[in-house]
Amino acid sequence: MRFAERALPLIALLLLGGCSTLSGTVQAVKDAVVTPVANAIAPANAASAPAVTAGEPAKKAEPVVLAPVDPNAQRAYDNALRALRAGRHDEAEKALKALTQSHPDLGGPHANLGILYRQAGKLPESVAALEKAVAASPQQALFHNQLGISQRAAGQFQKARTAYERAIELDANYAAPVLNLGILNDLYLADNARALELYDRYMAMTGGKDAAVAKWATELKNRKPDKLLTKKEQS
């Protein structure tokens, strides 16, 4: 049996409210590090920002009219991000929990809390937090992708498929859930044809530069189940 353990980078692209334009340079961080979200915040009913895949140039986003945001919430969120980046996870968790209670309509704190829980091995808590993130910001593809990762880790494979498919529906140019859905079909749903289709799609989206994914696709084409690979979802 194959396991999803290949170390692919997480991308720091999640938004606090799940709906503003992405700010700053896209920064890839190793999946051993909790991924902080971007600083921009907005209420859950605004439109989702387009996601940017690692290696792609950022595309100009359509302007979005944002409702005023509580400056105290932004300040608290910035402090939580600083704690995450500094590795002070207990402090970050406390701050994020406080934000989810004072501003439950903002998806970002829920999403960050879910990532923090997942990396601490608290999968039920991670899934619950990320479900709240997508409920607060249902148009944010990145939150759905993160939810799928936690659901897959928790053994909720059909729910993970739904989450990845929703992320793809929301942003057809977002490559990470395409790969994650391919891995899910390959390793857990036993749908080789669908997995191969998704691997090929991912490689087309990313310029075919991922040698490991190309190898997985070749294995499926050649029907060599004895060749075991380890794989890891992308954020």
Predicted regions and their residues:
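Alpha-helical segment of the N-proximal tetratricopeptide repeat
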Residues: L66-L106, I115, Q119
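Position-specific recognition of the canonical hydrophobic site in helix A of tetratricopeptide repeat
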Residues: L84, A111, R118, N145, ...
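Structural signature of tandem alpha-helical TPR/SEL1-like repeats
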Residues: A86-A98, Q119-K132, A154-R166, L189-L198, ...
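Canonical tetratricopeptide repeat
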Residues: N112, Q146, N180, K215-W216
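Bacterial signal peptide processing site
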Residues: S20-S23
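Terminal, low-structured helical/coil segments at or just beyond the last alpha-helical repeat
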Residues: Q27-A28, L187-S235
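Helix-start (N-cap) detector for alpha-helical repeat units in TPR-like alpha-solenoids
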Residues: A73, G107-G108, A141-L142, A175-A176, ...
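Structural marker of alpha-solenoid helical repeat scaffolds
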Residues: S102, A136, L170-D171, A204-T206
